[in-house]
């Protein structure tokens, strides 16, 4: 699952954003990708042109439900303090891939989730 498809918070634009490359890479591995974004879902839908392996969600927790990993791509404020127990209990594998390094790794791990911050040592 992916939280955040817009190229930056506050925008509905997805062009040249990192989410597009991630989605394409996942599709190349035959992965169905579930995405939440507060503004960019219409633009993402146009970009995907009806691709059957892209599922768009109005609710971030529905996007993450049963997911084997959740990648934070755009650091929208609504993602800053998620309900960690809800994520842990609903995900297939509670793995958080923090592409913006906004979460405290020790705290997330202490909540019972796996954590990897992209670019962290």
Language model: regions and residue ranges:
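Structural/interface elements that position substrates and couple domains in central-metabolism enzymes
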Residues: 1-121
